[in-house]
Amino acid sequence: MSVSDEVVLEQAQKLSVQVSSEEQARYVVDAVGSRLAAAALGLRDTRTVNSWAHGGPIKGPLHEHRLQALFRVTYAVKERYGPAVAAAFLRGSNPALGNRAPMTVLANESPADAEQATIAAVETLFAS
């Protein structure tokens, strides 16, 4: 992993705790689309994430943490490779995640475990 990759990962982590949930939701929706964002967040439809992107309330810390993790992963991959690769990364089967897609891990695992696992998968992507 190059220095610039480490910088991108560090920026993603810092921004995930500094940027508001509204801005995180807007960034993710703009980067990968509301359908993929909603699926990665474990939401039933796009209305909820679109509401968050426009300042709507997020009910519960689990949703906030899931959004934070999705933002961190999306930011890192998008900044390094662009939005199309970020979307493909979230959708695609990943050997670092037991051949599960990162969006599935983010939606179904505890937010802390999902964040750790998907960031490790991003690091593997950057190292290749």
Regions found by a protein language model. Give the residues of each.
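Non-transmembrane "mature" sequence context
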Residues: 1-128
